[in-house]
From Swiss-Prot:
Origin: domain of life: Eukaryota
Assembly, per entry: Interacts with isoform 1 and isoform 2.
Organism: Homo sapiens (Human)
Keyword Nucleus: yes
Example of a GO cellular component annotation carried by this entry: nucleus
Protein keywords: Nucleus
Segments of skewed composition (Basic residues): 179-188
Protein name: Laforin, isoform 9
Length: 344
């Protein structure tokens, strides 16, 4: 039988004080009386608490390496959903705090604050079942010791819905618990290379904290014609200059496209994000007249295929690429022409 790894796996006798049969018959030799003497006081709250691995006082050694009776720890650490260390150390677990294999103990405290829900297989004891009935937050086991328990990753998300909205709004400057909240630490301005300002009012930024460098906040410019006034934003179709968009595109700027003029941008349909221009040697001469006035193709239809694409289809369908025998008497062979034969 594997060593017991948490208080959940102990089987307690229904009568307190009556011993249970040992799990292996050879393991424990019970000598002396099997029942306590008459008049012995029954187990108090300390014994019941120790039996269920809930220490009454959380503190020092409870939260550090030694966890008495496999407890996750009381006090502040248990409130946020404590990391419980598994009590065995299989070799693949390394010296990892809260080992990866053995099921950890349950966190102390109410369920909505991360208590309960220990004892599962994959490095458990990391947080409890929240009010929605499943584990909401997985706490990473950083080597920071107690700071890993109390960071913002440990906070369990409250259940959405009615009880959040029916709660009266806290007074100004106070949190939901009533104590005054700490001033929020603003993100550094160095993360946002150009904080997006509302157009026309340079001092007033948007109602958002500056984003990180790689993912700026999405904003559609309304009245500015420059798509680079807000870098990284999606420009609106009517105000974007398509030549700037093509030249700034990471893929399309590689291809040699003729620059689209600003006048052609105004003729674009509103759904087209930019105008791709084909280089001059590939373009069909533009016919400005109506469809009936355009010159007809050889087949008599208005062929939508430009004439420079005609050789592509005929070339792919021809048999000239098929391998023929190199026979000089064969007129259809590759070297039938003597001048071509000399050239090769």
């Amino acid at each position: 039988m594997h060593p017991k790894e948490g208080a959940e796996q102990h089987v307690f006798s229904p009568v307190p004080g009556a011993p249970t049969p040992p799990p292996n018959r050879c393991g424990r030799l019970v000598l002396g009386p099997r029942l306590p003497a008459a008049g012995t006081p029954g187990p108090g709250i300390r014994a019941a608490a120790a039996r269920h691995a809930l220490p009454l006082w959380g503190g020092g050694a409870t939260r550090r390496g030694r966890r008495p009776a496999g407890a996750a720890g009381g006090g502040v650490a248990a409130r946020a959903g404590a990391l419980g260390a598994a009590r065995c150390r299989p070799p693949e677990a390394g010296r990892h705090r809260g080992g990866r294999r053995g099921p950890g103990p349950a966190g102390a405290g109410p369920v909505a604050r991360g208590g309960g829900a220990g004892g599962r297989g994959g490095g458990a004891g990391r947080g409890g079942a929240g009010p929605r009935g499943h584990v909401l937050v997985q706490v990473p086991e950083a080597g920071a010791g107690r700071r890993a328990l109390l960071g913002r990753y440990c906070q369990q998300t409250p259940a959405p819905g009615a009880e959040r909205e029916l709660r009266p709004a806290p007074p100004t400057g106070a949190s939901a618990s009533g104590r005054p909240r700490r001033p929020r630490r603003r993100a550094s301005r160095a993360f946002c290379p150009r904080p997006c300002a509302l157009p026309g009012r340079p001092g007033l930024t948007l109602l958002c904290r500056p984003r990180c460098r790689r993912q700026p906040r999405l904003r559609l410019p309304t009245d500015s014609l420059d798509p680079y006034s807000a870098p990284g934003r999606l420009p609106a179709h009517s105000v974007a200059c398509p030549s700037d968009l093509v030249s700034a595109h990471p893929v399309l700027s590689f291809f040699p496209t003729a620059p689209a003029s600003r006048a052609s941008a105004l003729r674009l349909p509103p759904g087209a994000p930019f105008a791709l221009r084909v280089p001059l040697d590939l373009r069909v001469p533009p016919f400005a007249g109506p469809l009936a006035a355009r010159p007809r193709a050889a087949d008599g239809f208005n062929s939508p295929t430009p004439p420079w694409l005609g050789f592509v289809s005929s070339f792919s369908c021809s048999n000239s690429l098929k391998k023929t025998q190199n026979d000089p008497t064969n007129e259809t062979s590759v070297f039938a022409n003597p001048r071509q034969q000399c050239a090769t």
